[in-house]
């Protein structure tokens, strides 16, 4: 018993000797990286990332000659930023998918909740865009639009579909 007490005390002292205090430093990002000041031949080169900044969980689809990109917005409102591109390099902000409070009830959500991993799809047969996502704490839902620049439907909740990161598949 005495040996066990001495061994335990020795281990506690050794663990305490190895403990170090965490050190934190200040971080600031102003959005003007020097790398973007280096000239490139834009006829066949581009900067990577093509979208610098906060664009988590990207999903894209193509309709005609235009690509559509959506990203997670978590508990920020309006929700799900939408961008368009003709070449997958030059992107233009095109508003948000969830622009009405009725589309995304965020009241009472913590910062770690909200809209995660939206997926955008285009169905050629009915010429309709669909955006499906998970509202953490409220479930999976989708919205649809014939023209993303003119707004999206009210959400259609998938009450019997659990899980996260849903996506649509349209068979040709």
Predicted feature residues:
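Bacterial Sec-dependent N-terminal signal peptides
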Residues: 1-22
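Carbohydrate-active catalytic/glycan-binding domains of CAZyme proteins
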Residues: 20-172
